[in-house]
């Protein structure tokens, strides 16, 4: 998008149709030039912003049908030119949407922090180049990818040759299906049986689908190697256009990144017979009003494997976050944490048991709006090799059951309770 970039330039993007995930995940990219101003590398940082606009606080609307309902889109916007941060341009972009960002000051601070993080990366890369030289650094970058490709090929070779199929469904019935063809040290992953893109926001951009595949390959390797595209070299991935896993531009995608990604992992692990399903959702919770916005994901149970019971109360697979401590939550927001505990008995029984989910109970202390985007409320995390499925999750407001995705106004004294799913068990229960 910017082939004429110069030293001191920095760019920002969150476009789900150009390598992004969903709009709150904003990527800042700093080109790295040599002393002759030749572009050699790029350093990037991606951070989840608390709010980038959209129809609900937290930019995770349960019922969005268009991308513009989910917030502001940065399409490779120039953030810094010749070392000068362009605050006015960023402010205009944050305010230009039909549903503008609610706290642009926070966005600006986060973007400046990402620019600073990139600068640290550029500095460290510079030290590496000074010590070893460009040719050696380039060579070892290639070696890292070659090593990843070799280890992935070795891991694939340990799998049984042939065709492995699996499918699962989201709570609305949408099917995610995969066929994996293993041939020696290579494989083809084909999602052709997956349903078309949906009207809602469960569509997963192609980049999210590839990321889920890469994650499973990295798990398959089982060694502490840097995550990189070399893992994909022995693998061919087929994703049908205009499907749930590769929607056309303009489709809403907020839940695809956080929910459908989990189901992609579930079907891949199921096809390969590696693990029972983990909770299969991020249990996305947002709340706020005109003064603040808060977003968190809630942990649940992990699926059991052939050698281990599932862990309880943990974030699994695509989540990559932690639950906020009750003390921090109560100090910063008008919320009282009434309960935060394991959901005992929610893990699926088996020779090896699935992990238990969590119970998170919040009392609201002032008027606000909350939203929940969750899955595994009607479908249950599958067991493997005769193991029982984990318990489905539940969302309740003042004791009344809610749908798996909901947004509502609440007032002082209202209590929200989220019970997260357990993981599936492995093997026939004793």
Where are these regions (language model features)?
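Glycine/proline-enriched, intrinsically flexible loops and inter-domain linkers
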Residues: 1-34, 39-188, 192-430
């Amino acid at each position: 998008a910017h082939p004429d970039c110069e030293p001191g330039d920095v760019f920002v993007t969150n476009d789900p149709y150009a390598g992004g995930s969903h709009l709150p995940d904003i990527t800042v990219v700093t080109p790295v030039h040599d002393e002759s101003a030749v572009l050699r590398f790029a350093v990037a940082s991606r951070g989840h912003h608390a709010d980038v606009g959209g129809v609900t606080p937290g930019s995770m609307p349960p019922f969005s049908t268009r991308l513009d309902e989910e917030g502001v889109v940065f399409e490779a916007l120039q953030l810094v030119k010749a070392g000068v941060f362009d605050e006015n341009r960023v402010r205009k972009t944050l305010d230009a949407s039909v549903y503008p960002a609610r706290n642009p000051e926070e966005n600006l601070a986060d973007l400046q922090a990402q620019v600073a993080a990139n600068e640290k990366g550029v500095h460290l890369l510079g030290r590496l180049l000074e010590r070893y030289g460009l040719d050696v650094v380039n060579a070892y970058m290639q070696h890292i990818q070659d090593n990843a490709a070799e280890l992935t090929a070795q891991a694939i070779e340990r799998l049984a040759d042939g065709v492995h199929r699996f499918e699962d469904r989201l709570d609305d019935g949408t099917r995610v299906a995969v066929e994996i063809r293993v041939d020696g040290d290579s494989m083809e992953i084909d999602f052709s049986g997956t349903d078309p893109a949906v009207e809602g926001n469960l569509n997963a951009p192609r980049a999210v689908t590839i990321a889920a595949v890469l994650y499973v390959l990295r798990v398959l390797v089982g060694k502490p190697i840097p995550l990189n595209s070399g893992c994909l070299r022995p693998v061919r991935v087929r994703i049908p256009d205009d499907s749930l896993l590769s929607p056309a531009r303009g489709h809403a995608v907020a839940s695809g990144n956080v929910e459908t990604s989990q189901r992609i992992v579930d079907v891949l692990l199921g096809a390969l017979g590696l693990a029972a399903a983990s909770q299969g959702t991020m249990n996305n919770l947002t709340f706020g009003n005109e003064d603040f916005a808060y977003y968190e994901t809630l942990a649940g149970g992990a699926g059991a494997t052939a050698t281990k019971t599932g862990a309880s109360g943990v974030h699994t697979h695509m989540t990559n976050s932690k639950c906020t401590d009750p003390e921090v939550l109560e100090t910063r927001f008008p919320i009282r944490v009434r309960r935060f505990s394991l959901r005992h008995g929610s893990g699926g029984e088996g020779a090896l048991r699935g992990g238990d989910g969590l119970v998170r109970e919040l009392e609201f202390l002032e008027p606000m709006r909350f939203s929940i985007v969750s899955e595994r409320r009607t479908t249950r995390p599958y067991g493997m090799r005769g193991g029982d499925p984990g318990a489905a999750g539940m969302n309740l407001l003042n004791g009344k059951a809610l749908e798996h995705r909901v947004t509502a106004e609440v007032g002082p004294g209202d209590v929200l309770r989220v019970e997260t799913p357990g993981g599936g068990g492995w093997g026939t229960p004793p």
